[in-house]
């Protein structure tokens, strides 16, 4: 008789995040419809979006004998679940992107900044951009991005020449953009040069002065690219202000991460035209979101894809070869798995390694500058 595989999925099905939790559960159910046979059973457990609720949900899951836990969503909930799962040797594939909760049988499927930063910097350096400015939110995410950038540039002999943090709740970025653009010095240099030219009576000086009438600044900034890890209206506001203070593309390239892909109408902001950003390949993702809308009549949250991929991963492992389907050795298969968000593989340290394509923003969307990998290089090779 075939082995029954029990998998628990821990989600906030009540509380403030219940709608998001339901969308993740819906996505998991699509994977079951697509791939599972009668020997795969998934059991949902409500974390209530709290640490206490997550602990109770994990205890219920291990009590019925689950072989693997998918979720929870929040890093604090993952911390609460870890000791419960570890006590019975059950691995956890969580939807968090916090590397701090990864390891020792806990694998995070979320998109960690390090890999995205590495991808975009690798491409930018290949295009000759070695001097970087960065404008990051003053929070854990922003600090993680900056740390990732420091690691990425060090191995490529590039450097950070300007770094500014901003309040993640801010709406006015004028001072910040003006400072990083070194606008006051460059504007002063223009005024001084104009004054100098006005004192001359030769034709060349007069022609030069006429050309300078349309400028606000003189001289270049001391960086080749600006990393903007923000998204949405903040991203658009900062990019627009940088252009206002004479930091223009393609002379200085604006760079972004995968959250740019969730910024609505990014192509409508002229100052972001020609920017580059790292993003997961979109073909399978678009198919998944289309099917989700067909099933449920609404568009899911962006991270719903993680629940689909985690469930699909569990089903594939359950259906292949005999033995311990969800052992750590099998979870970290070096060839990886092809998911909604592209190729990924779980690493022994508990982080999902992912592939990214490099996109350039255009007036009607984007063009792919470098496609994502379709196979992983050998680990350690």
Kindly give the residue locations of the regions a language model identified.
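Extracytosolic ligand-binding ectodomains
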Residues: 1-381
């Amino acid at each position: 008789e075939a082995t029954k595989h029990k998998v628990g999925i821990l989600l906030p099905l009540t509380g403030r995040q219940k709608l998001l939790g339901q969308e993740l559960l819906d996505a998991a159910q699509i994977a079951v419809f697509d791939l599972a046979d009668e020997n795969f059973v998934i059991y949902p457990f409500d974390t209530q979006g709290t640490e206490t609720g997550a602990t109770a949900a994990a205890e219920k899951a291990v009590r019925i004998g689950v072989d693997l836990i998918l979720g929870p969503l929040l890093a604090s909930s993952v911390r609460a679940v870890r000791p419960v799962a570890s006590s019975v040797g059950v691995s956890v594939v969580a939807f968090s992107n916090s590397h701090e909760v990864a390891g020792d049988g806990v694998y995070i499927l979320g998109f960690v900044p390090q890999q995205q930063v590495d991808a975009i910097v690798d491409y930018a350096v290949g295009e000759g951009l070695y001097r970087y400015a960065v404008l990051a939110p003053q929070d854990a995410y922003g600090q993680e991005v900056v740390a990732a950038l420091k690691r990425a540039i060090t191995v490529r002999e590039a450097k950070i020449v300007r770094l500014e943090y901003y309040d993640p709740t801010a709406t006015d970025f004028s001072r910040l953009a003006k400072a990083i653009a070194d606008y006051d010095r460059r504007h002063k240099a223009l005024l001084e040069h104009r004054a100098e030219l006005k004192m001359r009576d030769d034709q060349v000086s007069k022609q030069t002065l006429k050309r300078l009438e349309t400028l606000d600044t003189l001289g270049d900034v001391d960086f080749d690219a600006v990393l903007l890890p923000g998204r949405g209206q903040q991203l658009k506001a900062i990019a627009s202000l940088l252009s206002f203070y004479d930091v223009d593309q393609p002379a200085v390239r604006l760079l972004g991460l995968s959250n740019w892909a969730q910024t609505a109408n990014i192509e409508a902001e002229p100052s972001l035209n020609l920017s580059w950003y790292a993003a997961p390949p979109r073909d399978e993702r678009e198919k998944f979101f289309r099917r989700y809308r067909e099933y449920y009549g609404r568009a899911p949250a962006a991270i719903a894809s993680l629940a689909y991929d985690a469930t699909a991963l569990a089903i594939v492992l359950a259906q292949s070869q005999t033995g311990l389907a969800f052992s750590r050795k099998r979870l970290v298969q070096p060839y990886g798995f092809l998911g909604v968000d592209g190729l990924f593989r779980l690493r022994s340290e508990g982080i999902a390694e992912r592939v990214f394509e490099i996109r350039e923003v255009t007036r009607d969307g984007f063009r792919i500058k470098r496609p994502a990998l379709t196979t992983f290089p050998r680990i350690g090779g």
